[in-house]
Amino acid sequence: MGEEKPEPLDFVKDFQEYLSQQTQHVNMISGSVIGVKDSDDLQGELAQNGLEHPAVDMSLEDSSGMLVDGFERTYDGKLKCRYCNYATRGTARLIEHIRIHTGEKPHRCHLCPFASAYERHLEAHMRSHTGEKPYKCELCSFRCSDRSNLSHHRRRRHKLLPMKGARSALSHRKMLSVLQKRGNSLGYGRRLLINLSPPSMVLQKPSSEQHHLGDFTHDLPPHAHLHQEAYNGLGKDPQAIGGAIGSGSREDQDMALDNPLNQLSTLAGQLASIPSEAEGAPVSPGAESLPDEKPTFLVQQPVTAPAAVSVNTAQASSPITPEPRPAAHSGCSPGVGPCSERTSTPSGTNSQPGTPTPVQDPQMLHHCPHCHIYFPDNILYTIHMGCHGYENPFQCNICGHRCRNSYDFACHFARGQHK
């Protein structure tokens, strides 16, 4: 009963002395500058501030380890985080990053319990209270308060990817140059005919169906009208092509200067949009229906090549008697050069006096007797004839598929089944 229990104050003093001894021991090992200070002075500073500030190490030998504003710099001058390997050049960014480790959220909303470590997050949150929506979609009336929501809306609603227009135009020109370099290869031209989707085609119909051609041209792409305008001016003015192409945009000029092999690939797909032989073509009330008459297709030649002679058909009121042609090219080989007769478009026998006489050069055109297509180039003609079978002209020479007629044969290649 005579023993006295130690007072709590004595226990706190003993624990503080123990902490001071451990602190001095650590400072001696690390060579810190704080070791020069007395333990009493250190305890006084801790008592006044209530916080233990980290030591500021100054290394004069290694400049990469110097501390600026309490942050260590790396060898390339960036500020390094003391908790991880993150480094940045901006002090404000590093302070925001350190708040991830410390959990500090100094930016608080005065209307609700929301708090954030980033000021920009608080600004976006305040728009939910004010109702402000500064970000608007340029394709619809959608508005939002955050830019990330607008990006999500564009991807989900309009299927738009974050791609710049300048880069897409550059990649288009690069792809065009590659196609022009590879266009000299015969095998590559065949692959273009089979695989590429057609952008446009020049179409020539009888005069009885000219009023229906206007409805067909509305469905063509914009650059198809450029080709049509250049083709119509061939027989009138040699400079018509240059003026027609010069009036278009830069992208239209690139399409007009494309390789002729690329233009050949446009033929198969456009044939699919033309009615089959079983369906009667629409005619005007005052014109006669010609069941044996077929439209004539012409594959355009590039602008740099000599201008092709325009092919004009007689008016629908005058019947057309085509010259007899063999049903199959018996003397032709699919892989050999020109082997079909070079013919010209027949003119009407009893045409009206005001009808212009067709002007054409048989040496410029190569005719396919099966598909009724005229080619201004021997290479284009050879590639096309190589797709026909030897025994059966409507049998695919690549996969052996048998087609019923020229329409079915063109649709077979338009499906793009050959890889």
Curated annotation (Swiss-Prot):
The gene is ikzf5. A zinc finger (C2H2-type) spans 79-101, 107-129, 135-158, 366-388, 394-418. Residues 310-320, 341-360 have a biased composition (Polar residues). GO terms for molecular function: chromatin binding; DNA-binding transcription factor activity; RNA polymerase II cis-regulatory region sequence-specific DNA binding; zinc ion binding. GO terms for cellular component: nucleus. 'Pegasus' was the winged horse in Greek mythology. Transcriptional repressor that binds the core 5'GNNTGTNG-3' DNA consensus sequence. SUPFAM superfamilies: beta-beta-alpha zinc fingers. Residues 208-228 have a biased composition (Basic and acidic residues). It comes from Danio rerio (Zebrafish). This is Zinc finger protein Pegasus. Disulfide bonds: none annotated. Probably self-associates. It comes from the Eukaryota. Belongs to the Ikaros C2H2-type zinc-finger protein family. GO terms for biological process: determination of intestine left/right asymmetry; determination of left/right asymmetry in lateral mesoderm; determination of left/right symmetry; determination of pancreatic left/right asymmetry; regulation of transcription by RNA polymerase II. Its main location: nucleus.
